[in-house]
Amino acid sequence: MVLRQLSRQASVKVGKTWTGTKKRAQRIFIFILELLLEFCRGEDSVDGKNKSTTALPAVKDSVKDS
């Protein structure tokens, strides 16, 4: 009887701990995804200005004709 009660209490405690761990892991995962998305969009600068998203400068018309 006492052993069964202790077993139930332990399983409830583990269940609550696991639920909290899953929620925390989800929040961390979402934070990392949002950070990665901002970085890919170029919104990760310290001054709040967006970075240029183009890797190369635009090609001028005179260069394209050559």
UniProtKB/Swiss-Prot annotation:
Task: Kindly provide the PTM information from the record.
Answer: Phosphorylated by host PKC. Phosphorylation alters the stability and may also have an impact on the subcellular location.
Q: One biological process GO term for this chain?
A: monoatomic ion transmembrane transport
Indicate where this protein is primarily found: host cell
* Residues recorded with modification Phosphoserine: 7, 11
Q: Cite a single GO MF annotation.
A: DNA binding
Keyword annotations from UniProtKB, A to Z: Host cell membrane, Host cytoplasm, Host endoplasmic reticulum, Host membrane, Host nucleus, Host-virus interaction, Ion channel, Ion transport, Membrane, Phosphoprotein, Signal-anchor, Transmembrane, Transmembrane helix, Transport, Viral ion channel
Q: Which residues lie on this side of the membrane: Extracellular?
A: 45-66
Pfam families recorded:
Polyoma_agno (PF01736)
Q: Which InterPro entries match?
A: Polyoma_agno (IPR002643)
Task: Point out residues bearing the modification Phosphothreonine.
Answer: 21
Which branch of life, at top level? Viruses
List the Cytoplasmic topological domains: 1-27
Q: Report the transmembrane regions from the record.
A: 28-44
Q: Would you tell me the Gene Ontology cellular component terms?
A: host cell nuclear membrane; host cell plasma membrane; host cell rough endoplasmic reticulum membrane; membrane
Q: What does the annotation say about its assembly with partners? A: Homooligomer. Interacts with VP1. Interacts with large T antigen; this interaction may impact upon the activity of T-antigen on the control of viral gene transcription and replication. Interacts with small t antigen. Interacts with host CBX5; this interaction induces the dissociation of CBX5 from LBR, resulting in destabilization of the nuclear envelope.
Relate the protein's function as given in its record.
Alters the structure of the nuclear envelope by interacting with host CBX5 and disrupting CBX5 association with LBR. Involved in the perinuclear-nuclear localization of the capsid protein VP1 during virion assembly and maturation. Plays an important role in the release of progeny virions from infected cells and in viral propagation, probably by acting as a viral ionic channel in the host plasma membrane. Allows influx of extracellular calcium ions in the host cell. May contribute to viral genome transcription and translation of viral late proteins.
Family from the record:
Belongs to the polyomavirus agnoprotein family.
Query: What name is this protein filed under?
Result: Agnoprotein
Give the originating organism.
BK polyomavirus (BKPyV)
